[in-house]
């Protein structure tokens, strides 16, 4: 998958056009009949979304996702509470908007001209391309005229209008099925499971799903990069879109959108099939025996992140040893182990406890200006290449007019610490910054895979239990005597 990035020119153009369209309405947020007044009167902002690794999901019983975080900030900006409705498919989302059950659709939706006939698009906050996906091990199609199986796409998706345009323009025999009960992510799952041959999804969703289902692969792009946006009702009054424009401009100026982009998209761009398959196999075969230790000693960070750090260090091998003498699950040096009262570095529990304590210590040392949810990445870089070199990277970032408190800005300077023209400007000199960069990115990918894989397994288990419960209800159990003597169990006439 190609490297994901913000299309700033496209975002800027859409924002300017939207600003010009909304300019007359911006001053009157406080009107008695406008949408913003309705939202403030009821005290809640209603959004509809779908479950996906990017838009909305729960982790540790708390909501997360890029669209969720933006929507929560927008609700706070308006001074109201956020109400989230999760729908099973895209078609239901747009029904919510048409039926006035939602103020905004925040679900990673592509800017689409057909949708503008009924709905209004808001500002864009990242961009994607539409891609055809198939399963590794099957024949790779060269183009849409070369499909050897059935193409299935989600009802209500922008992919349908793209296919209609391509059919009219280039492939008149092109045909496809429309799924009314699955989201695009659900169809990606179906391709991974071998239940359907092909589907179309956006490049970001594919990159995220490959961390859980590495058997997914991209055949080719269907479109160029397109903006992703929120949708609202098409009303004469534009107060809601005007407020959204102001909000997104504020979030962009404050660096919030860039931080969310880094948090949710910054580590998605590269994909290693073999490494991902090996990691998922280790989750099944090795993690069950040591999971309780990560859960027990993960104090300041999520246990799955601690597990990802350990996998990057040792592949969960308690006897791992490097040529430099570091050992164990967390690959501690002798001096670090001594400072943490770890007497046996090859003891899994001692090593995990010590590594967790050391990581907590490193996070506490990170300068206070760094946002709470980014401190761990700075700490990991310091853990890998040394705290002093991490400070050098921050200073170099500031010298180059970047934000030293932003991981997105600092991480791209890490490789510069191994180049003389840059490290000669630093206090502590040469460092293997490219290794620290790769180290942190790998951990983030492992964490993403681990969280998604475990959630997917829980989802499948819940579906299985629900199916079994439905079966039991349809065919209730009977007493053994009644089963052996069915006639005697019947009521007398």
From Swiss-Prot:
The gene is mltF. It comes from the Bacteria. This is Membrane-bound lytic murein transglycosylase F. Its main location: membrane. It is found in: Cell outer membrane. Residues 269-493 are annotated as: LT domain. HAMAP family: MltF. GO terms for molecular function: peptidoglycan lytic transglycosylase activity. The keyword Signal applies. The N-terminal domain does not have lytic activity and probably modulates enzymatic activity. The C-terminal domain is the catalytic active domain.
